[in-house]
Amino acid sequence: MADGLTDIDSSQITTNYDEVVTSFDDLGLKDELLRGIYGYGFENPSSIQQRAILPVIKGNDVLAQAQSGTGKTATFSISALQNIDEKIKKPQALIIAPTRELAHQIQKVVLAFGEYMKIECHACIGGTSVAEDIRVIQEGVHVIVGTPGRIHDMIERRILKTDLIKMFILDEADEMLSREFKDPIYDIFTTLPETTQTVLLSATMPAEVLDITGKFMRDPVRILVKKDELTLEGIKQFYIDVEQESYKFEVLCDLYETINVSQAVIFCNTRRKVDYLTQALTEADFTVSSMHGETEQSQRDVIMKAFRTGSSRILITTDLLARGIDVQQVSLVINFDLPSNRENYIHRIGRGGRFGRKGVAINFVTSEDHGMLKELERFYSTEIVEMPTNIADLI
């Protein structure tokens, strides 16, 4: 499992495909792809990856009913990269997402996994330069990820040629088909070769999604992931505009001077950042403990025990802990980095409100993070407001 991924119990999955592969090494992946997966921080496949990667690699159409937070982005990214011929620098996989932010997130994952394959992946999204899209696509890319309108436009202009597309991936299909995207998505489908494999991911199965599966999918493998209902109810969510990355530490120290917190969890996106912040806070005379994916299990147990008993007041970690940490005293969660994928947000800040306790989440936001902040608000139908000056009274 990667630090940035939550997992689900295998009993929560139903499928008409029985084979389960519990190690990335046993999936028959290209060596360069494996290097990219492990380099990204993944250790073992999540439950959905154990079941879905193989049927996709084998060429089956796959219909996965899965909420965010189950590892589905990595599932289709790994599968697409395995089936791409990196020597042919033309679009071979087409991934459609409902928002620009999600498209960018997927692009980052594809590029990270495909680093050693020398994969070119372009995000083709509205609100950006059409001329730049044309230039990049004509220079040659292996994977296109984007929003329906712009992708449809590029196909209409005959810039994006679909004749070599092997795999078509529709993420958050229910969200797109319930909005204004139905017509462009249908039009895109009709431009694809008959042999194109379709992978469709959807949290729910409304009539619009079932209509697409009936029209465009051939005997799909079905994977249903039931997911715990999580809520942001009871969690007060704030952000601090830190402007740039280098100011975060100073802001954190200032914050700790104004509040009195029994315990807090601080989330960072990388192991390196956890190590840096641990050292910096220790040198500033804070009592902190930390753990991430490279921390030995025995050491993790010691650290968690110290945190549970209160002998450690600040725990710094990656998304390794974004699920399953039963620490009742945690009243404050600080996202030193906004999560790199939206689904981990609810698992991170859900720490604060467990067992009916109220909690506060404070997000450090750089000038580059405002798009992601808006995306989190949209995705969770919530409001994240600027931190008030009387924050100490709210914790």
Curated annotation (Swiss-Prot):
Placement of sequence motif DEAD box: 171-174
Name this protein carries in UniProt: ATP-dependent RNA helicase eIF4A
Keyword check for Nucleus: no
Positions of short motif Q motif: 22-50
Residues annotated to bind ATP: A66, Q67, S68, G69, T70, G71, K72, T73
Residue ranges occupied by any Helicase ATP-binding domain in the UniProt entry: 53-223
EC number: 3.6.4.13
Record key words, sorted: ATP-binding, Cytoplasm, Helicase, Hydrolase, Initiation factor, Nucleotide-binding, Protein biosynthesis, RNA-binding
Protein purpose: ATP-dependent RNA helicase which is a subunit of the eIF4F complex involved in cap recognition and is required for mRNA binding to ribosome. In the current model of translation initiation, eIF4A unwinds RNA secondary structures in the 5'-UTR of mRNAs which is necessary to allow efficient binding of the small ribosomal subunit, and subsequent scanning for the initiator codon.
GO MF terms held by the record: ATP binding; ATP hydrolysis activity; RNA binding; RNA helicase activity; translation initiation factor activity
Pfam family, one: Helicase_C
Main location: cytoplasm
Domain of life according to the entry: Eukaryota
Gene Ontology biological process terms, A to Z: cytoplasmic translational initiation
Residues of the Helicase C-terminal domain: 234-395
Enzyme category, top tier: hydrolase
Record-level GO cellular component terms: cytoplasmic stress granule
Notes concerning its domains: The Q motif is unique to and characteristic of the DEAD box family of RNA helicases and controls ATP binding and hydrolysis.
Catalytic reactions on record: ATP + H2O = ADP + phosphate + H(+)
Cited PROSITE patterns: DEAD_ATP_HELICASE, HELICASE_ATP_BIND_1, HELICASE_CTER, Q_MOTIF
Record organism: Yarrowia lipolytica (strain CLIB 122 / E 150)
Localisation per UniProt entry: Cytoplasm
Family note: Belongs to the DEAD box helicase family. eIF4A subfamily.
